[in-house]
Amino acid sequence: MLNSAMSVVILAAGKGTRMYSDIPKVLHTLAGKPMVQHVIDAATKLGAAQVHLVYGHGGELLKQTLKDDKLNWVLQAEQLGTGHAMQQAAPFFSDDEDILMLYGDVPLISVETLQRLRDAKPQGGIGLLTVKLDDPSGYGRITRENGKVTGIVEHKDATDEQRQIQEINTGILIANGADMKRWLSKLTNNNAQGEYYITDIIALAYQEGREIAAVHPARISETDGVNNRLQLSRLERIYQAEQAEKLLLSGVMLRDPARFDLRGTLHCGMDVEIDANVIIEGYVTLGHRVKIGAGCIIKNSVIGDDCEISPYSVVEDAHLEAACTIGPFARLRPGAELLAGAHVGNFVEMKKARLGKGSKAGHLTYLGDAEIGDNVNIGAGTITCNYDGANKFKTVIGDDVFVGSDTQLVAPVTVGKGATIAAGTTVTRNVADNELVLSRVPQVHKQGWQRPVKKK
């Protein structure tokens, strides 16, 4: 039977010495966001009324990074065990709510598994998440009598017989708030570690005749913790393999699932193709029949139907309408917008710029703070000079303009519809509709000229 409310405690006070880092362990990232954020997200999706984050090492950096006003920050000044950590949070527990305990360094725990654990919690008892391992060395063992859970024995305190038990404690459990506070008040540190173990509440509950229901996760990897960078890298690959599998089964063609990283949320239309070594970050939407070439990075962008992004292009905070083509080696920075059928070629960079329908910037170009009309040709080497050393200014180019190669447009400047800018021109004044503009130095020919001779 479920209580009407539930709060979550996330233990995140450890320094993570084996990470060999000045950054708190739980802030190391998996799939582009801190491990602890994955756990917070799971708690939120589960419907937690309150999330208590128990912190210690690097608390200020934790607060600066997470920036979540809904978190209740609970300081554990001394790390005296998991039971001690829960004791710091206990004053915030309501008697009539359930308390779910999670860990900031166990990032793959799923909402589905936690919901099953919550559903399985007996009235007045404890829901406990356990797994069976071929090699349970180092983990707390689940002790049973006649099939019923009676307690948890930490590895260092276990007898040889108990160490043969393969069912181990994951550390994740749920109990009523009033019961949790009572059991926490009875904990002692009379053990090999001299710490207060949260696991001792299992024996206390059993002694009171309370039922302990053990639940297994859908995947063992959900309960894997991180103590070093090797373990973190392994969980990263597990997570990415799971995301790739979901995409493949939903109809997305990943040419090499083992070389695809999703570090955010991806929504795809029909018949999307993604080549090897592509990284998706933030919130990305790909329309129908979109093709992403090898080595591309797409972040917080919307890509319209039938667009093709050629290899090694970077697209960030950009919006592409239908049938646009990008790259290879193109860079769309925040604020870039391509209207239907526009083309951005190799070594072209756009920032806060709009390229109109059917317009093309094929090679070696910078378009910043610019508004470019429809059917415009931007020649190779064109630069919108948008910065005077203090302020940014805008360039406006009308429809059907032809901009020759090696042109500089010194903003603020406007080029009218149908104008032609000759190659090598520096445009410093507004250009009227249909004008031809050129600013070349007259070409000089010197007959009989000889190159200088190198001095010996």
UniProtKB/Swiss-Prot annotation:
Organism domain of life: Bacteria
EC number, UniProt record: 2.7.7.23, 2.3.1.157
BP term (GO), one: regulation of cell shape
Xref: Gene3D superfamilies: Hexapeptide repeat proteins, Spore Coat Polysaccharide Biosynthesis Protein SpsA, Chain A
Record's cofactor remark: Binds 1 Mg(2+) ion per subunit.
Region of interest: N-acetyltransferase: 251-456
InterPro entries xrefs: Bifunctional_GlmU, GlmU-like, GlmU_C_LbH, Hexapep, Hexapep_transf_CS, MobA-like_NTP_Trfase, Nucleotide-diphossugar_trans, Trimer_LpxA-like_sf
GO molecular function: glucosamine-1-phosphate N-acetyltransferase activity; magnesium ion binding; UDP-N-acetylglucosamine diphosphorylase activity
Positions of UDP-N-acetyl-alpha-D-glucosamine binding: 11-14, 25, 76, 81-82, 103-105, 140, 154, 169, 227, 333, 351, 366, 377
Quaternary assembly: Homotrimer.
NCBIfam families linked to this entry: glmU (TIGR01173), PRK09451.1 (NF006986)
The protein's name: Bifunctional protein GlmU
Gene source species: Salmonella typhimurium (strain LT2 / SGSC1412 / ATCC 700720)
